[in-house]
UniProtKB/Swiss-Prot annotation:
Full protein name: Tryptophan--tRNA ligase
Matches recorded under SUPFAM superfamilies: Nucleotidylyl transferase
Family matches, as InterPro entries: aa-tRNA-synth_I_CS, aa-tRNA-synth_Ic, Rossmann-like_a/b/a_fold, Trp-tRNA-ligase, Trp-tRNA-ligase_bac-type, Trp-tRNA_synthetase
Enzyme Commission code: 6.1.1.2
Keywords assigned by UniProt, alphabetized: Aminoacyl-tRNA synthetase, ATP-binding, Cytoplasm, Ligase, Nucleotide-binding, Protein biosynthesis
GO biological process: tryptophanyl-tRNA aminoacylation
Short name of any one Pfam family annotated for the protein: tRNA-synt_1b
Functional note: Catalyzes the attachment of tryptophan to tRNA(Trp).
Binding site for L-tryptophan: D132
Motif annotated as 'HIGH' region, chain positions: 10-18
Oligomeric and partner information: Homodimer.
Amino acid sequence: MKTIFSGIQPSGVITIGNYIGALRQFVELQHEYNCYFCIVDQHAITVWQDPHELRQNIRRLAAKYLAVGIDPTQATLFIQSEVPAHAQAAWMLQCIVYIGELERMTQFKEKSAGKEAVSAGLLTYPPLMAADILLYNTDIVPVGEDQKQHIELTRDLAERFNKRYGELFTIPEARIPKVGARIMSLVDPTKKMSKSDPNPKAYITLLDDAKTIEKKIKSAVTDSEGTIRYDKEAKPGISNLLNIYSTLSGQSIEELERQYEGKGYGVFKADLAQVVIETLRPIQERYHHWMESEELDRVLDEGAEKANRVASEMVRKMEQAMGLGRRR
């Protein structure tokens, strides 16, 4: 059985973009693959985090993973900082990565642009991400387009390590879903929907109530033409809404174009709002159940225990290959 690894930062907000692009497919993948789903809290502290808020967000994210349908009997759900091997492996990989490779990362350029000072952690984020993936002999990493460059660097580091120290790592592949992988902002459909957008109208969260969802979709940017057809270049706003509708309803974009032929944006948006509300309602109910349940800690304890067994063994092999410590 092939292995999948995926990590999400505990930022406190999960958008429907995250749900469609990642979480939703995780639920299907867990039955076909050996899956590790990681709450990457060490990645989160590359920028300042309020400690109390971070700890709350870790718990909330775990509850959201379970609420969308991750089954702890089928997949391993754990917190990155509870598995020390991640930081240990990241240091070893930092020692074989080049500064130039890290500085070329698009995300580093974007996040450091215009800032007087940036943390070293922001620059060395990719080796930690590579460690996350390589520790579990990962075959497949489901990611959005924006993470492709990091996976390419992970592959380079795995190949470099294998060449220098002997075959140890599986070379992972990125899996980018074709439909709905890149859900765009509701206020600027040329940009990806992001939880860090300063305008809350730009995204819908997993926990938004019905009224908020209706308002956000009603105010979503479209165009003045008024016809419901998919054209990413000329009609990015309505194309983005069609993408959301198609992915959540299971109807093809062609079916939706026929269904709404001759109908206005108002009718389409009202129907889409109901599709989103009905999709999120059971998730929200399960989320509140998990947040109030002591079972959540048991799931995370078991996940950390399982991940530690696998990851610590890989770190031992890495250290042995690099000549660290004593041979036992």
